[in-house]
Each structure stands twice: as structure tokens, then as C-alpha cells.
Amino acid sequence: VAHVELSLSEVRVPAVGTPAEQEYDNLTSWSVAVSRAAEPCVLIAADTRVVAVSAAGSQLLFLGGCRDMIGQPLLDGSLRLLDFTANRGELTEPELDKIPPLLAITSGRLARGLLRIKGVSARAPDATVDAISTPVHRAGAVVGSLTFFSEV
């Protein structure tokens, strides 16, 4: 049985005389929501730098402290992605371009896929997560992506 939860939030109304673009920035708004989220999620800018990550997302992706990742490229070495072969090799550059957070930015569409994340130590198990990403827009242009994760 499917379960859907919805919530309502207040609509931001720009102050009189203030251009809507300045007051309402999607990345900034989403960064507040992501940093406070109980769900594992990450928000990245179009240049792939991490804008916000939830505590659960940081733990699930073996990223260390949430604040340490802010401003760092998502794939700077902290996030070690593996292929699904028996050899568990690290993903190559063309494969990395197809992971959901980056694919949502380049395609401007929803992206979904499984990711295998290398454990933090040799004995730690790898994590397999389902990633669902959506592009974040501003003035019709993609400025980042928001990704939610679920451990498989």
C-alpha cells in the first residue's frame, strides 16, 4: 500500500517594491529545508558544490560532518561511488556524470538510480541507496539539484 504525506507551508510574498528574484532564491530556500530535514537528502549547486546536506544524508553517504561538506564538490573524494560488479571498482568519469544528482542538473529533468557507496573502512559494509533527484530552477534555468536517498 502506498503512503503519501503532504504538508502545507506559507507562501512567501515579496515586500512591496522588492523584486521577487532577490527575495526568493530557490537554492537558499531549499538549503534551509534540507539542513533541517530528518530524511537523507543533499542539495547541490549547478557547479556540483554541496549547498546543504541533512544529518541523515551525511550519515547514510558516509560524508562525515554536514558542515564540512558545505561548499565542497560532491565528488571531491569524500563520496566514493562503486560500480555494481563483483570487483566493486570505483565509477569512471562517464559513469559519474550519470548519477542522479548530476543527471538532474544536465538534463533538467527528474533522475533516479541506485548508487553503491564505499564504506568508511575496509571492514565497513558498502551502502546501496536509491537516489531520486529533481532539478532546482531559478528564472527558468537549472541552478542545482535536490536529491533524496533511501537505503536499499
Model feature map: region roles:
Residues 2-10, 91-129, 143:
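Per-ARNT-Sim (PAS) sensory domains and their PAS-associated C-terminal
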Residues 131-133:
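Sensory input modules used in signal transduction
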Residues 45, 121, 137-138:
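Short, acidic, Ser/Thr-enriched surface-loop or helix-capping motifs
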Residues 4-19, 28-32, 37-107, 135, 140-152:
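PAS-family sensory domains
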